[in-house]
Regions:
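A short loop-to-beta-strand scaffold at the N-terminal edge of the catalytic core in hydrolase folds
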Residues: 5-16
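Conserved HGGG/HGGXW glycine-rich cap/lid loop of the alpha/beta-hydrolase fold
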Residues: 15-54
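Conserved alpha/beta-hydrolase "nucleophile elbow" surrounding the catalytic nucleophile
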Residues: 26-28, 52, 80, 84-89, ...
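Active-site loop/oxyanion-hole signature of alpha/beta-hydrolase fold enzymes
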Residues: 46-83
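Flexible "cap/lid" loop of the alpha/beta hydrolase fold
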Residues: 90-135
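Conserved alpha/beta-hydrolase catalytic His-Asp/Glu region
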Residues: 117-118, 128-181
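Short beta-strand/loop motif that positions the catalytic acidic residue
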Residues: 178-179, 185-187, 191
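Conserved alpha/beta-hydrolase "acid-adjacent" motif
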Residues: 192-198
């Protein structure tokens, strides 16, 4: 099995069936390779999301809903189950409002914003405001990134950094009660990035 280029000519995926029933969506900074060990156990497809793995970056920054719209038109109509890890879980929830699926399996997905994310977003908005006024030195910019930025934020650049900010700001708390698709949650009890309390509240 090898990566195949999908019909958009930009996005790659691991596909082991002409009519895959399960679509795997990886987390931020990851790739379809995360699912290689289980891919062959199912009729499935695992996407390298735009901007990750072998897939090209999007032309403009995207939020999870825009990823969902893009992918819904890209994956085979035979897909019945979406498996989303972290960032991929957010995308899966949005996809369920575009097309009917039998089940969403969400693994450590940041469905609602926690206090740490909210605090970071508040600081980031102030930082952007001051930066637009040219009131922040290069040294201060670097200090801000090192102090408040997550590893994902530090590693992302350009379009993908803007995409990350949009992803963090995407709060699904109002959407979740409206989901008509069966959802199963898988969480790590000791997950410190997306704590178990997020799953309990969702």
């Amino acid at each position: 099995m090898a990566l195949q280029l999908l019909k958009d000519g930009k996005t790659f995926a691991e596909i082991n069936s002409d009519e895959p029933k399960i679509c795997f969506l990886h987390g931020w900074g990851r790739s379809s390779n995360d699912f290689i060990k289980i891919l062959n156990k199912f009729e499935s497809i695992a996407i390298d999301l735009p901007g990750f793995g072998k897939s090209e970056e999007p032309e403009n920054s995207m939020n999870p809903k825009e990823y969902a719209e893009y992918l819904t038109n890209l994956i085979p109509d035979t897909v019945e189950v979406l498996v989303g890890h972290s960032f991929g879980g957010k995308i899966a929830v949005h996809m369920s409002f575009i097309k009917k699926y039998e089940k969403l399996l969400l693994i450590g997905a940041p469905l609602i914003r926690n206090n740490r994310q909210a605090n970071f977003n508040f600081r980031l908005n102030i930082y952007k405001f001051l930066n637009n006024l040219n009131l922040i030195s290069e040294k201060s910019k670097e200090k801000f990134k090192n102090k408040y930025g997550s590893e994902d934020y530090k590693n992302a650049t350009g379009i993908m950094r803007d995409t990350l900010v949009k992803t963090v700001n995407d709060d699904l708390s109002e959407l979740l009660p409206k989901v008509n698709t069966k959802i199963e949650l898988i969480w790590g009890e000791n997950d410190t990035v997306i704590p178990l309390s997020i799953a309990e509240e969702a």
